[in-house]
A protein has these predicted regions:
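Transmembrane beta-barrel strands of outer-membrane/channel proteins
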Residues: 144-152, 190-196, 247-251, 303-309, ...
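N-terminal periplasmic/intermembrane-space "pro-region" immediately following the signal or transit peptide
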Residues: 7, 19-151, 155, 161, ...
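Detector for outer-membrane/organellar transmembrane beta-barrel domains
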Residues: 336-438, 452
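Surface-exposed coil loops of outer-membrane beta-barrel proteins
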Residues: 203-235, 242-332
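Short loop/turn motifs that connect adjacent beta-strands in outer-membrane beta-barrel proteins
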Residues: 80, 86-92, 118-144, 177-190, ...
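Outer-membrane beta-barrel "beta-signal"
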Residues: 59, 482-494
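Residues that define the transmembrane beta-barrel architecture of outer-membrane proteins
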Residues: 126-127, 154, 164-170, 227-232, ...
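Residues on the lipid-exposed face of transmembrane beta-strands in outer-membrane beta-barrel proteins
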Residues: 146, 170-178, 234-238, 291-295, ...
Length: 494
């Protein structure tokens, strides 16, 4: 079947909807990416008004969702040379990125907005200053997301090992748009990620709740500690054909692009167990040399492929120890629908992977879906399922896995906390993992977990997140059948 026919067939199953262009610029609240709205002047956080005029806003994107037309139009209305003819040459360090198709836009364009609507504290010096810095750097093509957090974790009942963990963890991801054609059809950019963390009463490299429990899953998805600052991602990219195609090569964190899900946005604002952040059965390497390409021919379909090495250690030269015996290939196809059987928007992803681990080739596949529960509902359902053969499972320690759950996003109140924010939510998740034979000896073959998490936005850039998990039958536990993992973290999102 031709690509155009596929796109038309998928589009026929959706309900088209676009936001009308506005004559006068207004601030946009992306509303978790599902239903962007123009904010009334009284709704705009003072820190946002003081730091950036509405005409310069490029709203924050949400990975796992196609960027809404109203948000993309913010960028296009500011493009240099738009409407001018003839158009010649390239723009270097442009203040706006080149064109990307909507799903790819959410992956590669961070935006220049960090201040969120908030019903508790709407102005503080930290938020205003952070927004000014973000706006200034975007004038030179650099857009980023900076997460800074403090996390406290306790295990109950207590194990024979360490039971409480206090740590600071930080992550910076960004895209530096280096140059683009003046008609915005193509461009060159640099992607990067820097992570660093430090346990205040333990070493993040030697100890964790995971090691104390003997679990296959990692309840502390926030841990970023390595040998100082390390770079999981540093790659040069190119986009062309009006943003329909992207190619990128260098040191890659594959999990930044594949296996996204809007209802499990990761440890800072979503469920904190690492098994909910990405499919635990799939190998999604970071800090490894590789190549990634993405293609979105129409709004309702995309495809991605990545290939990387798998044996590079933290902060090691990515060219060291390169071997065809430690290599990974993964492909993903995504089907994006505005309405599925009247339930609302949904995205369904299929994944296939080949892994060479120590000279043994293994295969696996995964399924990843996100689905609104009711049209325009703040309630959403997510699930990931993955199966690997024994050779592929040796690379992750997981032969099969399934995670599923619900997220209730704001707004779920008329006023105050939970009325408007892109972070306020309550999430519930269930996980199951079956250990690979490479994990022997093991006390249990199957491991289960439950997690309940909530996010309370306090200032335009800071939220609190209490979280409780119960891990049943940890794979390597010999002294108990399960334990609670209690966490509290405070997070700045700049």
């Amino acid at each position: 079947m031709k690509v155009t026919s596929l796109c038309y067939m998928l589009a026929a199953t959706t309900v088209a909807g676009t936001a009308a262009a506005q004559q006068d610029p207004s601030y946009i609240d992306t509303s978790y990416g599902w239903r962007p709205v123009l904010m009334e002047i009284i709704e705009v956080p003072v820190s946002l008004k003081d730091a950036m005029p509405a005409g310069e806003q490029m709203a924050r994107r949400h990975s796992g969702l196609s960027t809404a037309p109203a948000v993309i139009n913010q960028t296009r209305s500011r493009d240099e040379d738009t409407g001018k003819a003839p158009c010649h040459g390239w723009r270097f360090l442009p203040s706006t990125p080149q064109k990307f198709m909507p799903y790819l836009d959410a992956l590669f364009v961070p935006g220049n907005t960090c201040v969120e609507p908030c019903g508790i504290i709407c102005q503080d010096m930290v938020s205003t200053g952070a927004q000014k810095i973000k706006r200034f750097l975007s004038h030179y093509g650099f857009q980023y997301d900076l997460t800074m957090s403090y996390n406290y974790t306790a295990i109950h009942p207590r194990t024979r090992h360490r039971n409480d963990f206090s740590s600071f963890n930080h992550s910076l991801t960004g895209t530096w748009f280096l140059a683009k054609d003046c008609d915005n059809s193509q461009g060159v950019f640099l992607t990067m990620e820097a992570d660093w963390g430090q346990g205040t009463n333990f070493s993040e490299r030697r100890s964790s709740a995971q090691s104390s429990l003997g679990s296959l899953c990692n309840p502390q998805g926030s841990l970023r500690g390595g040998k100082g600052v390390f770079l999981p991602q540093l790659a040069l990219g190119y986009s062309g054909f009006d943003g329909k195609w992207v190619a990128m090569a260098g040191t890659l964190d594959v999990s930044n692009y594949l296996d996204q899900n809007a209802y499990t946005p990761g440890w800072a604002g979503g469920l904190m167990n690492q098994s909910f952040g990405s499919n635990p059965a799939l190998l999604l390497p970071w800090a490894n040399l590789g190549f990634l390409t993405a293609w979105q021919p129409c709004e309702n379909f995309y495809a991605m492929y990545a290939t990387t090495s798998t044996n590079t250690g933290v902060n090691q030269n990515p060219f060291s120890d390169l071997s065809a015996n430690y290599w990974m290939h993964i492909a993903e196809a995504g089907f994006i629908m505005d309405d599925v059987l009247g339930m609302g928007a949904g995205t369904y992803r299929l994944q296939y992977t080949m892994i060479d681990h120590g000279g043994d080739m293994g295969l696996g596949f995964g399924l990843n879906l996100q689905q609104q529960v009711g049209k325009n509902s703040p309630l959403g359902f997510f699930t990931r399922v993955g199966f690997m053969d024994q050779d592929a499972a040796a690379a992750t320690g997981t032969k099969a896995a399934a995670t599923a759950g619900l997220m209730l996003q704001a707004p779920f109140r008329k006023s105050g906390w939970g009325s408007r924010s892109n972070y306020d939510n309550v999430s519930l998740g269930f996980l199951w993992q079956r250990a690979a034979s490479s994990e022997k000896p093991m006390a249990n073959k199957d491991e289960y977990g439950l997690e309940l998490s909530a996010v309370v936005q306090v200032t335009p850039t800071f939220f609190l997140q209490p979280d409780v998990q119960y891990i049943f039958n940890p794979i390597h536990a010999t002294d108990k059948d399960g334990a609670f993992v209690l966490q509290m973290q405070g997070v700045f999102k700049f």
